[in-house]
């Protein structure tokens, strides 16, 4: 009788598997592989090697607390001669001395998560069980059979592997790129992402069913959308929009997801204070990329928050044009969400591809504060019956806006406002470049096209099909040069009379600070022209001077000022409204890299900023992050005040761990100048 087969050890071949599965950054101390693609194992036996004629090897892979073959969370499979498509399999690849090298294959629809792998070796009537190790299984956008497959290597690099990028803020007429450190492969982040799945309410209610459903990126995306906010659960971030962040961190101060996720884990899954839309979106992007789902952050300018699903945002204003209506339905200056790439077998053909997911807690979906995934194509087509939450996302990019002026006697007059169009300049970072890509066309057909009319008809969006009222008099807000924080500047109400008649009216100009979500602050400039005459076929530009001393104490960290012009013509009973959001530029953060960037060789970054204000800055700090360049976030305090016009300079030590292109991301804070962002690309060569 043959001697019993005894396993001495199992080599999980971390280096080779990490290279083959694009998980090298995760495979330093553990095995992380992607589903639907074989990975290597080497079995080392004591005494003798495996003999096919006398030995039987049966493998068992399980995930979750209650694994079962029926749920797809347990797999039993024997060593065989060939792989079977769509099934777990083990195939011998090489045999020498007392070692046996294997290819282990996983189905392209296996649940993602943490697995335990064991072996039962039988020789005749003898048998022994051995624990081979543990591994983590991720979605695989390189595998054609996987629901997240992308056929472009450049897109896989950008949307799965790239650890830094940009989030777009500012305004539709002044788009500002904000650098962000996603850091999905940084130390401990994968474990945190898996923990996030394991504390979601669906797992707590029925762990076996939840783990089974993790085979679907649609399901996982929806769970992540709900878990990034903490409104229903032990989610990551608490949202706050009132500019009172003293007991936490201002949403504008974050520069990456890593610090947020680590804080959440460190504090026992307690909510991190505070987030706003781009922070929710960026953290969701980190989690989804880490799990292997191609994902990008998207910004929509002039984004509607339509609560009652009538695709209409109504503003009620007093006779001076000031909004007096409820703030629950608003036009946000911009709003961020994410798109993830996946098939939709639960929907009709044609709805695969980019899916919108919005983790910012706004409205409940099936009892939970989450939104999506909904096919971007369904939004474009006006197919509002499509899962999930199509009406809400459709309204964000297509809602109509009506302004009502309420007179002293209570009567309402509809104003003409062509300056505010919902759903503009929908933006994301370009693939492989530090540029902005405009993806508005993927959400909306060209304005006025037959396809747009069909989509609006399908969505029953009748407001958009009504021709806009024209009077022959138009007004828009123009800006001058030098729109920098700390400066005085001019804005202009530019009025055009395209009619053969003279028009006379009253012009009210008002500038107020504003948060990105449309909440107005105090006035910082006004003008009231009681009698303004417009000659036939003429133009006029009326200036409004905005002084730093007026806005310095009330400008929010959004750096936005809303300028409103209201032209009232009593003779024609006409109200012409124009608005524009102005973004004030922060000073530039300059970053110099001292020395040649080489792998595993110390490096110094010199970071500087010039105070643009007329007063000194105190409490100055620089915070630095950069996946692959610096292990943990570093903060450098500046002990002395920085006088007006003076330059402040600090140095930070770096240790690049990986060859390639990385971003060093910087945030500057002080008492009077906050959330100033900067970045520098660093190309690291081999040592």
Swiss-Prot record:
Domain of life: Eukaryota
Record-listed N6-acetyllysine modification sites: 468
Post-translational modification: Disulfide bond formation inactivates the calcium-dependent acyltransferase activity. Cys-370 can form disulfide bonds with both Cys-230 and Cys-371: formation of a disulfide bond between Cys-230 and Cys-370 facilitates formation of the disulfide between Cys-370 and Cys-371, which promotes inactivation of the acyltransferase activity. May also form interchain disulfids between Cys-230 and Cys-370. Ca(2+) protects against disulfide bond formation and inactivation.
Expressing tissues: Highest levels are detected in the lung. Lower levels are found in the liver, spleen and heart, but not in the brain.
Protein name per Swiss-Prot or TrEMBL: Protein-glutamine gamma-glutamyltransferase 2
Site (Important for catalytic activity): 516
Family: Belongs to the transglutaminase superfamily. Transglutaminase family.
Active site (UniProt): 277, 335, 358
Regulation: Acyltransferase activity is regulated by the binding of GTP and Ca(2+): inactivated by GTP, which stabilizes its closed structure, thereby obstructing the accessibility of substrates to the active sites. In contrast, Ca(2+) acts as a cofactor by inducing conformational change to the active open form. In absence of Ca(2+), Mg(2+) may bind Ca(2+)-binding sites, promoting GTP-binding and subsequent inhibition of the acyltransferase activity. Extracellularly reduced and activated by CLIC3.
Taxonomic lineage of the native organism: Eukaryota, Metazoa, Chordata, Craniata, Vertebrata
């Amino acid at each position: 009788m043959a001697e019993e087969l005894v396993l001495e050890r199992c080599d999980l071949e971390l280096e080779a598997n990490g290279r083959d599965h694009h998980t090298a950054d995760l495979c330093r101390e553990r095995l992380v592989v992607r589903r639907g693609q074989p990975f290597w194992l080497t079995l080392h036996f004591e005494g003798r090697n495996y003999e096919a004629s006398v030995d039987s090897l049966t493998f068992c892979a399980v995930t979750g607390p209650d694994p079962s073959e029926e749920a797809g969370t347990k797999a039993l499979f024997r060593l065989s001669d060939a792989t079977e498509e769509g099934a777990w399999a083990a195939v011998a690849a090489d045999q020498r001395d007392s070692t046996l090298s294997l290819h282990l294959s996983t189905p392209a629809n296996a649940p993602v998560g943490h697995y335990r792998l064991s072996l039962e070796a039988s020789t005749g009537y003898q048998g022994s069980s051995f624990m081979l190790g543990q591994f983590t299984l991720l979605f695989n956008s390189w595998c054609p059979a996987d629901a997240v497959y992308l056929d472009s290597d450049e897109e896989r690099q950008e949307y799965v592997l790239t650890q830094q990028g940009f989030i777009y803020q500012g305004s539709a007429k002044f788009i500002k790129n904000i650098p962000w450190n996603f850091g999905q492969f940084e130390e401990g982040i994968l474990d945190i992402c898996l923990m996030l799945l394991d504390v979601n309410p669906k797992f707590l209610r029925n762990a076996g069913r939840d783990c089974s459903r993790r085979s679907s990126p649609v399901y996982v995306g929806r769970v992540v959308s709900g878990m990034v906010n903490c409104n229903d659960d032990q989610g990551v971030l608490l949202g706050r929009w009132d500019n009172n962040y003293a007991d936490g961190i201002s949403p504008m101060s974050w520069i990456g997801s890593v610090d947020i996720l680590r804080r959440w884990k460190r504090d026992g899954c307690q909510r991190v204070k505070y987030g706003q839309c781009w922070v929710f979106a960026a953290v969701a992007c980190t989690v989804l990329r880490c799990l292997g789902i191609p994902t990008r952050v998207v910004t929509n300018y002039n984004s509607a928050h339509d609560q009652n699903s009538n695709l209409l945002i109504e503003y009620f204003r007093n006779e001076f044009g000031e909004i007096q209506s409820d703030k629950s339905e608003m036009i946000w200056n911009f709003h961020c969400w994410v798109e993830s790439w996946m098939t939709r077998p639960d929907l009709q053909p044609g709805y695969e591809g980019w899916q919108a997911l919005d983790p910012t807690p706004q409205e409940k979906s099936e009892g939970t504060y989450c939104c999506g995934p909904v096919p971007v194509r369904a939004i474009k087509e006006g197919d509002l019956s499509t899962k999930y939450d199509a009406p809400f996302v459709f309204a964000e990019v297509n809602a109509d806006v009506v302004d009502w002026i309420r007179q002293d006697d209570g009567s309402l007059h509809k104003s003409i406002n062509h300056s505010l169009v919902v759903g503009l300049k929908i933006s994301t970072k370009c693939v492989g470049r530090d540029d902005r890509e405009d993806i508005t066309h993927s959400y909306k057909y060209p304005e006025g096209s037959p396809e747009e009319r069909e989509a609006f008809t399908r969505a029953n969006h009748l407001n958009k099909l009504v021709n806009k009222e024209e009077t022959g008099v138009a007004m828009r807000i123009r800006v001058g040069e030098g729109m920098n924080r700390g400066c005085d500047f001019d804005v202009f109400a530019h009025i055009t009379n395209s009619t053969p008649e003279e028009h006379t009216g009253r012009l009210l100009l008002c500038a107020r600070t504003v948060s990105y979500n449309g909440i107005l602050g105090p006035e910082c400039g006004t003008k009231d022209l009681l009698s303004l005459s417009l000659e036939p076929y003429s133009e006029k530009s009326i200036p409004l001077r905005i002084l730093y001393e007026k806005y310095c104490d009330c400008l929010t960290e959004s750096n936005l000022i809303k300028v409103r012009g209201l032209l009232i013509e009593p003779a024609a009973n006409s109200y012409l409204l124009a608005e524009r959001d102005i973004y004030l530029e922060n000073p530039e953060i300059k970053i110099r890299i001292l020395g040649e960037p080489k792998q595993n060789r110390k490096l110094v970054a010199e970071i500087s900023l010039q105070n643009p204000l007329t007063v000194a800055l105190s409490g100055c700090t620089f915070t630095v992050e950069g996946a692959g360049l610096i292990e943990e976030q570093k903060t450098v305090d500046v002990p002395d005040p920085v006088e007006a016009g003076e330059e402040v300079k600090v140095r930070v030590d770096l240790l690049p761990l990986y060859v390639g292109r990385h971003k060093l991301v910087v945030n500057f804070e002080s008492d009077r100048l906050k959330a100033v962002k900067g970045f520098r690309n660093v190309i690291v060569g081999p040592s």
